[in-house]
Amino acid sequence: NAPGQPHPREGLRQNWQQLSPGFKRFLLPAGVFALGYFSLGFFLLRAHDVGFSMTDVVLLYALFNTTCVVVAPLVGHLGDRVGRSRIVLLGYGAYAGLNLWMVFAGTRWEMIAVFCIYGVFYAIEESQSKAFIADIEPERRATAMGAYNFVTGLLYLPASLVAGALWTLSPSLAFGLAAALSLAAMAVFVRVRPAAGPAQ
């Protein structure tokens, strides 16, 4: 290191210490949720098992993306009106509901509905979680976003690995665990009540 420059580890520690308690509390439910947030590929695979051809599975993926794009502006507007923490909590609940539904879903129409709702959930997860972080950490937004991506990124991999292992026993086990962890994340979120700014 150049003279006068802090050691990288010291810089990371200092950045972490400067982050607000509210943001650090938010990492708890975010981490629990990430443990159950496995790849969309499992949903696509389940749709194929139900009877969708590979071409139809691609169309389901397109439906998911289209729903996400259409709903995203509405989700953002709703977050501004009712508070982003409520929308984040709604996202956790939507993912729990999706996975519970997948435990019992066995028809094509149910799968179509699932992928529409998944698009709504994804719009919430991709936009409102990050917007909520910006509310909590307006001055250290980049540092907070990096910490959030680091923590959740570490947990996404084991989430898919565990889901894959459970899938070999029964797809219902994988979806059931994801639903349970999503509900647990909701409970932790309500318990720790991470604080946000005026939009809250």
Show where each model-derived region lies.
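Structural signature of the two symmetry-related core transmembrane helices
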Residues: R86-W101
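Helix-to-loop junctions at the C-terminal end of transmembrane segments
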Residues: V71-G83, W167
